[in-house]
Amino acid sequence: MISKIRNFLTRKVGSKVLTKWVSEEYLLNNREEREKNRISENRGHEVYYFHQLKDPYSYLACQTLSELLDIYNINLKILVVGEPNIIHEPDMFYEYCFDDASSIASNYGLNTLPSKLPSSSAIKLGERILLNEENLGHDLLIRITEKVWSNEIKELEELSKHTQEVENHLEENNLKRKTLGHYQGGVFHYEGENYWGVDRLSYLEDRLEALSLKKNDNTINKGPKMIRRPSPFEHEEELILEFFPSLNSPYTYISFERVKQIESDYPVRVITKPVLPMLMRNMEIPSYKGKYILTDTAREARRLGIKIGPILSPLGKPAERAYSLFPWVNSHGKGLDYMYELMKSSFADGVDIGEKKYLKNLIKSLDLNWKE
Protein backbone atom coordinates (compact mmCIF):
# COMPACT_ATOMS: atom_id res chain seq x y z
CA MET A 1 0.00 0.00 0.00
CA ILE A 2 2.80 2.40 0.96
CA SER A 3 4.60 1.56 -2.29
CA LYS A 4 1.47 2.36 -4.31
CA ILE A 5 1.05 5.71 -2.56
CA ARG A 6 4.71 6.55 -3.15
CA ASN A 7 4.45 5.68 -6.85
CA PHE A 8 1.27 7.74 -7.16
CA LEU A 9 2.87 10.80 -5.55
CA THR A 10 6.01 10.42 -7.66
CA ARG A 11 3.95 10.34 -10.85
CA LYS A 12 1.93 13.38 -9.78
CA VAL A 13 5.05 15.41 -9.00
CA GLY A 14 6.62 14.28 -12.27
CA SER A 15 3.46 15.26 -14.11
CA LYS A 16 3.71 18.83 -12.81
CA VAL A 17 7.32 19.11 -13.97
CA LEU A 18 6.61 17.70 -17.44
CA THR A 19 3.55 19.91 -17.83
CA LYS A 20 5.57 22.97 -16.84
CA TRP A 21 8.25 22.19 -19.40
CA VAL A 22 5.76 22.19 -22.29
CA SER A 23 3.95 25.33 -21.15
CA GLU A 24 4.23 28.37 -23.43
CA GLU A 25 3.98 30.58 -20.34
CA TYR A 26 7.05 28.83 -18.89
CA LEU A 27 8.90 29.40 -22.17
CA LEU A 28 8.06 33.11 -22.38
CA ASN A 29 8.85 33.75 -18.70
CA ASN A 30 12.24 32.10 -19.15
CA ARG A 31 12.98 34.24 -22.19
CA GLU A 32 12.05 37.41 -20.34
CA GLU A 33 14.24 36.47 -17.39
CA ARG A 34 17.19 35.55 -19.62
CA GLU A 35 16.97 38.85 -21.48
CA LYS A 36 16.91 40.81 -18.21
CA ASN A 37 20.01 38.96 -17.03
CA ARG A 38 21.80 39.46 -20.35
CA ILE A 39 21.21 43.22 -20.22
CA SER A 40 22.21 43.53 -16.56
CA GLU A 41 25.42 41.57 -17.24
CA ASN A 42 26.14 43.73 -20.30
CA ARG A 43 26.49 40.69 -22.57
CA GLY A 44 26.03 40.66 -26.31
CA HIS A 45 23.69 38.35 -28.18
CA GLU A 46 25.82 35.20 -28.22
CA VAL A 47 24.73 32.16 -30.20
CA TYR A 48 26.59 28.90 -29.61
CA TYR A 49 26.96 26.36 -32.38
CA PHE A 50 28.13 22.82 -31.51
CA HIS A 51 29.78 21.01 -34.41
CA GLN A 52 30.54 17.29 -34.51
CA LEU A 53 32.71 16.21 -37.42
CA LYS A 54 31.21 12.72 -37.74
CA ASP A 55 27.66 14.02 -37.56
CA PRO A 56 25.69 14.27 -40.84
CA TYR A 57 23.39 16.93 -39.38
CA SER A 58 26.42 19.08 -38.50
CA TYR A 59 27.55 18.79 -42.11
CA LEU A 60 24.29 20.46 -43.12
CA ALA A 61 24.02 22.94 -40.26
CA CYS A 62 27.45 24.48 -40.74
CA GLN A 63 26.43 25.55 -44.26
CA THR A 64 24.01 28.09 -42.72
CA LEU A 65 26.54 29.88 -40.48
CA SER A 66 27.60 32.50 -43.02
CA GLU A 67 23.98 33.49 -43.68
CA LEU A 68 23.24 33.59 -39.98
CA LEU A 69 26.03 36.11 -39.42
CA ASP A 70 25.07 38.16 -42.48
CA ILE A 71 21.45 38.51 -41.43
CA TYR A 72 21.56 38.80 -37.63
CA ASN A 73 23.49 41.04 -35.27
CA ILE A 74 24.92 38.24 -33.13
CA ASN A 75 28.20 36.92 -31.82
CA LEU A 76 28.67 33.35 -33.02
CA LYS A 77 30.73 31.02 -30.84
CA ILE A 78 31.63 27.76 -32.57
CA LEU A 79 32.58 24.78 -30.39
CA VAL A 80 33.74 21.45 -31.81
CA VAL A 81 32.34 18.53 -29.82
CA GLY A 82 32.61 14.75 -29.78
CA GLU A 83 29.99 12.05 -30.03
CA PRO A 84 27.20 11.78 -27.44
CA ASN A 85 28.18 9.80 -24.34
CA ILE A 86 25.41 7.29 -24.96
CA ILE A 87 24.45 6.04 -28.42
CA HIS A 88 22.10 3.07 -28.52
CA GLU A 89 22.91 0.85 -31.53
CA PRO A 90 25.60 3.22 -32.91
CA ASP A 91 25.88 1.57 -36.34
CA MET A 92 22.14 1.82 -36.93
CA PHE A 93 22.10 5.35 -35.49
CA TYR A 94 24.71 6.72 -37.88
CA GLU A 95 23.24 4.87 -40.84
CA TYR A 96 19.87 6.47 -40.14
CA CYS A 97 21.36 9.95 -39.60
CA PHE A 98 23.33 9.70 -42.83
CA ASP A 99 20.32 8.58 -44.88
CA ASP A 100 18.04 11.18 -43.29
CA ALA A 101 20.46 14.09 -43.73
CA SER A 102 21.12 13.03 -47.33
CA SER A 103 17.41 12.95 -48.11
CA ILE A 104 16.57 16.38 -46.63
CA ALA A 105 19.59 18.39 -47.84
CA SER A 106 18.10 19.45 -51.17
CA ASN A 107 14.80 20.43 -49.50
CA TYR A 108 16.72 23.05 -47.53
CA GLY A 109 18.86 24.23 -50.44
CA LEU A 110 22.04 22.72 -48.97
CA ASN A 111 24.89 20.73 -50.46
CA THR A 112 24.26 17.03 -50.12
CA LEU A 113 26.58 14.73 -48.19
CA PRO A 114 29.50 12.84 -49.74
CA SER A 115 29.00 9.14 -50.41
CA LYS A 116 29.99 7.87 -46.94
CA LEU A 117 30.84 8.83 -43.38
CA PRO A 118 34.37 10.16 -42.75
CA SER A 119 37.05 7.86 -41.38
CA SER A 120 38.08 7.99 -37.73
CA SER A 121 41.57 9.12 -38.80
CA ALA A 122 40.17 12.08 -40.75
CA ILE A 123 37.91 13.01 -37.84
CA LYS A 124 40.77 13.02 -35.32
CA LEU A 125 42.95 15.14 -37.59
CA GLY A 126 40.09 17.55 -38.24
CA GLU A 127 39.35 17.87 -34.53
CA ARG A 128 43.00 18.58 -33.82
CA ILE A 129 43.13 21.37 -36.40
CA LEU A 130 39.89 23.03 -35.35
CA LEU A 131 40.40 22.73 -31.60
CA ASN A 132 43.76 24.49 -31.88
CA GLU A 133 41.97 27.62 -33.10
CA GLU A 134 41.35 30.03 -30.22
CA ASN A 135 38.44 31.79 -31.95
CA LEU A 136 37.21 29.34 -34.54
CA GLY A 137 35.59 30.98 -37.56
CA HIS A 138 32.94 29.48 -39.81
CA ASP A 139 35.07 29.64 -42.96
CA LEU A 140 37.78 27.39 -41.52
CA LEU A 141 35.16 25.14 -39.95
CA ILE A 142 33.48 24.52 -43.30
CA ARG A 143 36.79 24.05 -45.14
CA ILE A 144 38.07 21.45 -42.67
CA THR A 145 34.68 19.73 -42.47
CA GLU A 146 34.75 19.27 -46.25
CA LYS A 147 38.26 17.83 -46.11
CA VAL A 148 37.27 15.46 -43.29
CA TRP A 149 34.20 14.22 -45.14
CA SER A 150 36.26 13.82 -48.32
CA ASN A 151 38.84 11.85 -46.29
CA GLU A 152 41.71 14.04 -47.52
CA ILE A 153 44.14 12.54 -45.03
CA LYS A 154 47.38 13.92 -46.51
CA GLU A 155 46.13 17.51 -46.55
CA LEU A 156 44.75 17.16 -43.02
CA GLU A 157 48.07 15.75 -41.81
CA GLU A 158 49.90 18.69 -43.34
CA LEU A 159 47.54 21.22 -41.74
CA SER A 160 47.84 19.56 -38.33
CA LYS A 161 51.66 19.38 -38.28
CA HIS A 162 52.25 22.18 -35.79
CA THR A 163 49.18 21.66 -33.62
CA GLN A 164 48.97 20.40 -30.03
CA GLU A 165 46.97 17.65 -28.34
CA VAL A 166 43.33 18.68 -27.96
CA GLU A 167 41.62 15.99 -25.88
CA ASN A 168 41.10 18.35 -22.95
CA HIS A 169 39.60 21.01 -25.24
CA LEU A 170 37.18 18.48 -26.67
CA GLU A 171 36.05 17.39 -23.20
CA GLU A 172 35.59 21.02 -22.15
CA ASN A 173 33.38 21.64 -25.17
CA ASN A 174 31.41 18.46 -24.49
CA LEU A 175 30.83 19.65 -20.93
CA LYS A 176 29.70 23.06 -22.16
CA ARG A 177 27.19 21.39 -24.48
CA LYS A 178 25.87 19.27 -21.61
CA THR A 179 25.66 22.31 -19.32
CA LEU A 180 23.57 24.09 -21.95
CA GLY A 181 21.21 21.13 -22.14
CA HIS A 182 22.10 19.10 -25.22
CA TYR A 183 23.97 16.02 -26.35
CA GLN A 184 24.25 16.07 -30.17
CA GLY A 185 26.13 17.93 -32.90
CA GLY A 186 24.56 20.40 -35.32
CA VAL A 187 22.98 22.25 -32.38
CA PHE A 188 22.46 25.99 -31.98
CA HIS A 189 21.97 27.49 -28.52
CA TYR A 190 20.74 30.93 -27.56
CA GLU A 191 19.96 32.04 -24.01
CA GLY A 192 18.54 28.86 -22.54
CA GLU A 193 17.10 27.23 -25.66
CA ASN A 194 18.55 24.66 -28.04
CA TYR A 195 17.80 24.27 -31.74
CA TRP A 196 18.98 20.95 -33.18
CA GLY A 197 19.57 20.90 -36.92
CA VAL A 198 18.52 23.00 -39.89
CA ASP A 199 14.85 22.07 -39.49
CA ARG A 200 14.77 23.90 -36.15
CA LEU A 201 16.69 26.95 -37.33
CA SER A 202 13.48 28.86 -38.07
CA TYR A 203 12.68 28.87 -34.34
CA LEU A 204 16.02 30.54 -33.61
CA GLU A 205 15.37 33.04 -36.40
CA ASP A 206 11.95 33.88 -34.96
CA ARG A 207 13.52 34.55 -31.58
CA LEU A 208 16.33 36.71 -32.94
CA GLU A 209 13.89 38.69 -35.07
CA ALA A 210 11.65 39.27 -32.04
CA LEU A 211 14.67 40.89 -30.37
CA SER A 212 15.11 43.21 -33.38
CA LEU A 213 18.46 41.67 -34.30
CA LYS A 214 17.94 41.55 -38.07
CA LYS A 215 20.41 43.61 -40.08
CA ASN A 216 18.43 43.34 -43.32
CA ASP A 217 15.25 41.86 -44.78
CA ASN A 218 16.79 38.49 -45.67
CA THR A 219 16.02 35.24 -43.91
CA ILE A 220 17.52 31.78 -43.89
CA ASN A 221 14.03 30.33 -43.42
CA LYS A 222 15.10 26.72 -43.28
CA GLY A 223 12.02 25.69 -41.36
CA PRO A 224 10.20 22.36 -41.59
CA LYS A 225 8.82 21.67 -45.03
CA MET A 226 5.20 20.55 -45.17
CA ILE A 227 4.80 18.39 -48.27
CA ARG A 228 1.29 18.30 -49.67
CA ARG A 229 -0.12 15.43 -51.69
CA PRO A 230 -0.48 15.83 -55.45
CA SER A 231 -4.07 15.91 -56.61
CA PRO A 232 -5.21 13.48 -57.81
CA PHE A 233 -2.87 10.80 -56.43
CA GLU A 234 -3.18 7.27 -57.74
CA HIS A 235 -1.13 4.13 -57.27
CA GLU A 236 -1.83 0.70 -58.72
CA GLU A 237 -0.66 -1.24 -55.68
CA GLU A 238 -1.50 -0.72 -52.05
CA LEU A 239 1.24 1.09 -50.17
CA ILE A 240 2.22 -0.07 -46.69
CA LEU A 241 3.32 2.38 -43.99
CA GLU A 242 4.70 0.72 -40.86
CA PHE A 243 4.27 2.90 -37.78
CA PHE A 244 6.17 2.16 -34.56
CA PRO A 245 4.57 4.22 -31.76
CA SER A 246 5.91 4.33 -28.20
CA LEU A 247 3.45 5.28 -25.48
CA ASN A 248 5.99 7.44 -23.65
CA SER A 249 7.31 9.32 -26.69
CA PRO A 250 6.25 12.97 -27.14
CA TYR A 251 7.38 12.83 -30.78
CA THR A 252 5.11 9.82 -31.32
CA TYR A 253 2.19 11.78 -29.91
CA ILE A 254 2.49 14.73 -32.29
CA SER A 255 3.09 12.45 -35.28
CA PHE A 256 -0.28 10.70 -35.00
CA GLU A 257 -2.42 13.31 -36.73
CA ARG A 258 -0.08 13.41 -39.72
CA VAL A 259 0.08 9.62 -39.92
CA LYS A 260 -3.70 9.50 -39.94
CA GLN A 261 -3.74 12.24 -42.59
CA ILE A 262 -1.38 10.22 -44.78
CA GLU A 263 -3.71 7.25 -44.43
CA SER A 264 -6.62 9.49 -45.47
CA ASP A 265 -4.89 11.24 -48.40
CA TYR A 266 -3.07 8.32 -50.02
CA PRO A 267 -3.81 4.71 -50.95
CA VAL A 268 -1.85 3.67 -47.88
CA ARG A 269 -2.51 1.00 -45.29
CA VAL A 270 -0.95 1.81 -41.93
CA ILE A 271 0.35 -1.15 -39.96
CA THR A 272 0.73 -0.17 -36.32
CA LYS A 273 3.55 -1.90 -34.42
CA PRO A 274 3.87 -0.52 -30.87
CA VAL A 275 7.28 -0.58 -29.21
CA LEU A 276 8.15 -0.50 -25.53
CA PRO A 277 9.37 2.90 -24.26
CA MET A 278 13.15 3.20 -24.01
CA LEU A 279 13.04 3.65 -20.24
CA MET A 280 11.14 0.37 -19.94
CA ARG A 281 13.92 -1.35 -21.89
CA ASN A 282 16.55 -0.25 -19.37
CA MET A 283 17.98 2.37 -21.72
CA GLU A 284 19.56 5.37 -20.07
CA ILE A 285 18.12 8.79 -20.94
CA PRO A 286 19.72 11.77 -19.12
CA SER A 287 17.26 14.30 -17.71
CA TYR A 288 18.58 17.10 -19.97
CA LYS A 289 17.88 14.91 -23.02
CA GLY A 290 14.35 14.25 -21.80
CA LYS A 291 13.79 17.95 -21.22
CA TYR A 292 15.01 18.90 -24.69
CA ILE A 293 12.76 16.31 -26.33
CA LEU A 294 9.72 17.60 -24.44
CA THR A 295 10.37 21.30 -25.05
CA ASP A 296 11.14 20.64 -28.71
CA THR A 297 7.95 18.63 -29.07
CA ALA A 298 6.00 21.45 -27.43
CA ARG A 299 7.12 24.09 -29.95
CA GLU A 300 6.39 21.71 -32.83
CA ALA A 301 2.96 21.02 -31.34
CA ARG A 302 2.23 24.76 -31.13
CA ARG A 303 3.30 25.21 -34.75
CA LEU A 304 1.01 22.38 -35.85
CA GLY A 305 -1.90 23.44 -33.65
CA ILE A 306 -1.76 20.28 -31.53
CA LYS A 307 -2.70 20.52 -27.86
CA ILE A 308 0.01 19.40 -25.45
CA GLY A 309 -0.27 19.31 -21.66
CA PRO A 310 -1.16 18.48 -19.00
CA ILE A 311 1.05 15.39 -19.16
CA LEU A 312 0.98 12.21 -17.08
CA SER A 313 3.66 9.72 -18.11
CA PRO A 314 2.30 6.20 -18.68
CA LEU A 315 5.60 4.52 -17.80
CA GLY A 316 5.37 1.23 -15.93
CA LYS A 317 2.09 -0.50 -15.11
CA PRO A 318 -0.17 1.94 -17.02
CA ALA A 319 1.76 1.31 -20.24
CA GLU A 320 1.87 -2.44 -19.63
CA ARG A 321 -1.91 -2.60 -19.14
CA ALA A 322 -2.59 -0.46 -22.20
CA TYR A 323 -0.21 -2.48 -24.38
CA SER A 324 -1.74 -5.77 -23.20
CA LEU A 325 -5.03 -4.90 -24.93
CA PHE A 326 -3.46 -3.82 -28.21
CA PRO A 327 -3.34 -7.22 -30.02
CA TRP A 328 -7.06 -7.73 -29.42
CA VAL A 329 -8.00 -4.16 -30.36
CA ASN A 330 -5.79 -4.31 -33.45
CA SER A 331 -7.41 -7.57 -34.56
CA HIS A 332 -10.62 -5.55 -34.84
CA GLY A 333 -8.95 -2.93 -37.04
CA LYS A 334 -8.78 -0.25 -34.34
CA GLY A 335 -5.11 -0.42 -33.35
CA LEU A 336 -4.07 2.99 -34.69
CA ASP A 337 -7.08 4.76 -33.19
CA TYR A 338 -6.54 3.00 -29.87
CA MET A 339 -2.92 4.10 -29.61
CA TYR A 340 -3.84 7.65 -30.65
CA GLU A 341 -6.47 7.96 -27.93
CA LEU A 342 -4.05 6.59 -25.33
CA MET A 343 -1.43 9.15 -26.26
CA LYS A 344 -3.87 12.06 -26.34
CA SER A 345 -4.94 11.08 -22.84
CA SER A 346 -1.33 10.98 -21.58
CA PHE A 347 0.06 14.03 -23.38
CA ALA A 348 -2.92 16.37 -23.74
CA ASP A 349 -5.24 15.51 -20.84
CA GLY A 350 -2.95 14.19 -18.09
CA VAL A 351 -5.05 11.05 -17.64
CA ASP A 352 -3.86 7.77 -16.09
CA ILE A 353 -4.29 5.34 -18.98
CA GLY A 354 -3.72 2.34 -16.71
CA GLU A 355 -7.01 2.75 -14.85
CA LYS A 356 -9.49 -0.04 -15.62
CA LYS A 357 -12.40 2.40 -15.84
CA TYR A 358 -10.53 4.54 -18.37
CA LEU A 359 -9.60 1.55 -20.54
CA LYS A 360 -13.15 0.22 -20.41
CA ASN A 361 -14.57 3.56 -21.58
CA LEU A 362 -11.95 3.83 -24.32
CA ILE A 363 -12.78 0.37 -25.65
CA LYS A 364 -16.47 1.27 -25.73
CA SER A 365 -15.74 4.55 -27.54
CA LEU A 366 -14.07 2.51 -30.29
CA ASP A 367 -17.32 0.53 -30.69
CA LEU A 368 -15.74 -2.60 -29.26
CA ASN A 369 -17.13 -4.95 -26.62
CA TRP A 370 -15.20 -4.76 -23.34
CA LYS A 371 -16.63 -8.11 -22.20
CA GLU A 372 -14.95 -9.98 -25.05
Language model regions located:
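N-terminal leader/targeting and pre-domain segments
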Residues: 1-34, 39
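C-terminal cap of thioredoxin/glutaredoxin-like
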Residues: 5, 16-19, 59-69, 141-232, ...
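Short acidic/polar alpha-helix capping motifs at helix-coil junctions
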Residues: 27-32, 223-225, 273, 288-290
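Short secondary-structure boundary/capping segments within folded domains
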Residues: 38-41, 67-68
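Short active-site neighborhood of thiol/selenol oxidoreductases, capturing the structured segment around
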Residues: 41-57, 75-76, 235-250
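Structural alpha/beta surface segment adjacent to cysteine/selenocysteine redox centers
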Residues: 53, 59-148, 254-346
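Short, solvent-exposed loop/turn segments at secondary-structure junctions
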Residues: 56, 83-84, 193-195, 201-202, ...
